[in-house]
């Protein structure tokens, strides 16, 4: 069997996607298995699901970010719960066997109730589309450079919220696939650090590349106790405290490690977008 993967930011929104799916429906492609990358919920129709199912696809993948309407508004994800429910119904009607959803915990301004909304949504989908296997992949929010939330840190409560989702969903037969909170912390360490992390990276490379190895190397760098082979005789600057890099919310005036690089949006615009997003703290204010 040949396998063809259709990849793109939003494959199903391509103006000729329907024509392509129809073309692939020809008998001469009976030995071809077709799959698509993550799709927008609003583009999922019974016809699309049927076309994919007829070509060997078993599931669809949708990024929902959160089961909370408010949190999706915060991250500017234009998606409603009804669209998610409709996508699940259409996937099942078209003959697909599973639906994979992806989301996050620990987003700026997220509350416990928002995480409960994610669990509620999955349980509702389980009830309204019986027989459709549900998977939720969930990661911890990690701030990225040149984005409105670049000043935010990793929220420690995210680890507890991952466990809360597991407690609510796994007993109901929903496949929860959380990314490691610990490795998300290391992602944040790398994405938010400056040149002072160089010695830590060298030290980790020369030892165990594990969570414990990263933390041990960072402690050694902070105390100036890295092996001579790591520093190679160079007077390396000490990195800042662990929490200051990973968890602290940086001031708007903080000079960021990447400020010397020109991104698509300037600092003023990013700050404005962050302010707008964080102003959405009252769920009732979205009506």
Q: Model features per residue range: what roles?
A:
Residues 54-58, 124-136, 156-176, 201, ...:
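Structural recognition of alpha->loop->beta junctions
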Residues 152-161, 168, 280, 284-287:
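Short secondary-structure subsegments characteristic of cysteine-rich extracellular domains
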Residues 2-3, 30-33, 93, 131, ...:
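Intrinsically disordered or highly flexible coil/loop and linker segments, enriched in small
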Residues 1-135, 139, 143:
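Conserved SAM/AdoMet-binding glycine-rich loop
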Residues 9, 42, 139-140, 147, ...:
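Flexible, active-site-adjacent loop/turn segments at secondary-structure boundaries
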Residues 15, 47-48, 70-75, 105-113, ...:
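Flexible glycine/acidic-rich beta-alpha junction loops that bind and position SAM and/or redox cofactors
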Residues 171-287:
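Radical SAM enzyme core and accessory elements
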């Amino acid at each position: 069997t040949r396998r063809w993967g259709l990849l793109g930011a939003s494959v199903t929104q391509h103006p000729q996607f329907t024509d392509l799916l129809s073309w692939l429906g020809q008998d001469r492609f009976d030995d071809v298995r077709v799959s698509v990358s993550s799709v927008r919920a609003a583009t999922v129709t019974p016809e699309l699901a049927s076309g994919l199912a007829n070509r060997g696809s078993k599931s669809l993948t949708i990024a929902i970010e959160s089961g909370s309407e408010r949190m999706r508004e915060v991250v500017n994800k234009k998606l409603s719960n009804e669209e998610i429910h409709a996508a699940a119904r259409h996937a099942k009607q078209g003959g697909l066997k599973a639906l994979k959803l992806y989301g996050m915990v620990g987003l700026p301004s997220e509350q416990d109730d928002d995480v409960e909304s994610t669990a509620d949504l999955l349980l509702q989908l389980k009830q309204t589309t019986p027989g459709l296997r549900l998977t939720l992949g969930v990661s911890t929010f990690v701030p990225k450079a040149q984005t409105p939330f670049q000043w935010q840190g990793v929220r420690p409560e995210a680890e507890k919220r991952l466990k809360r989702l597991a407690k609510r969903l796994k007993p109901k037969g929903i496949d929860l696939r959380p990314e490691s909170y610990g490795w998300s912390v290391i992602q944040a360490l790398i994405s938010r650090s400056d040149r002072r992390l160089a010695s830590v990276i060298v030290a980790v490379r020369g030892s165990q590349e594990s969570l414990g190895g990263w933390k041990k190397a960072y402690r050694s760098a902070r105390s100036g106790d890295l092996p001579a082979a790591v520093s190679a005789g160079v007077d390396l600057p000490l990195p800042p405290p662990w929490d200051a890099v990973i968890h602290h919310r940086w001031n708007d005036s903080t000079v960021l490690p990447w400020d010397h690089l020109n991104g698509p949006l300037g600092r003023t615009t990013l700050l404005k977008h962050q302010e707008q997003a964080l102003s959405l703290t009252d769920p009732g204010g979205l009506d």
